[in-house]
Amino acid sequence: MKSAALQLHNAANDNGLELPLSWARFGICVFPIAAETKLPLIKRWPEQATTDLAVIEAWARRFPGCAWGASTGDSVFAVDIDVPHASKPDAANGFATLASLQWQVPDTVTQVTMRGGMHALFRAPPRESGWYAKTQAGAAMPADWCAHYGVPAGYRLPGVDVRGSGGYVR
């Protein structure tokens, strides 16, 4: 993925096509979701998510004011770093968890979330490698990923979730 400095995106300030078009240009499949509920606005979104800029622009006209989902699965997975917020003031702070490990988000596609957390998107290893990212909360990261990024294998990361096969991030 490209430089995080060029791709940091604040979801709270996005109401247009900047986000989905930039994701698509980097090979991340996107689809429209309802801004309030984060629910997909198209049927069969896992199959319909696309990097086709013309399709994305057509969806923007069809669903004005929609938000956008980035599909995760075989080619891309996301690390979702949560923070405490008004509706969950006692939630774990994922940034604090990662800081306690002296771990920083590697150079990748990132986005500040609506509640002040972060989504960091990564290319998934080829399926034939045997590696598989599944969607899970309080993630125990895969051993090879942990080794590569310096996180203890099997460590549960409070406030850090993985979005993998069948998942998406907003």
Q: Where is each model-derived feature located?
A:
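Conserved phosphate/metal-binding and DNA-contacting active-site motifs used
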Residues: 1-170
